[in-house]
Amino acid sequence: MTRGEPLKIVPARFDDAPAMLAMQRLAFEPEARASRSSEIPPLQETVEGIREHIRTATVLKAMDGDRLLGSVRGILAGGTCLIRVLVVAPDAQGRGLGAALLAAIEDAHPRIERFELTTNMAMVGNVRFYLRHGYEMVEQLQHSAAIRLAFMRKIARR
């Protein structure tokens, strides 16, 4: 990270969408390899799809100066916040950015009863990450022939 300038987690803007898409394609490539499938939803997304989430959901980005290091989305559905596409740039992983983004999206929704997400079972480290942060495995879902998802939930502590 840049010396003297702290990491900032702030709302994403429409003009962030191309950089967000480029970063998520790099970051989700290992998942595609592990699954032996390019059917990973973040790899199928478009700039327009990201812009739609920026318009309709809570989309946060992690910035180090002018550099985008990560992002996360929170989509409200009743008393639930669906966490989608938590992503950290490959060269910035392992430094706590994912945990900071997860905490920020949870903090952005103080009245929510629960948080839910899915993550690829092939990415064991990701499943462990969410378990460490208070999420419980609810069930496993078959997304496609090659992709099995962990459906996880965390009850909000308020």
Where are these regions (language model features)?
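Conserved acetyl-CoA-binding loop of GNAT-fold acetyltransferases
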Residues: 110, 131-140
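Conserved GNAT acetyl-CoA-binding A-motif
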Residues: 109-120
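Conserved beta-strand in the GNAT
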Residues: 61, 67-75, 82-87
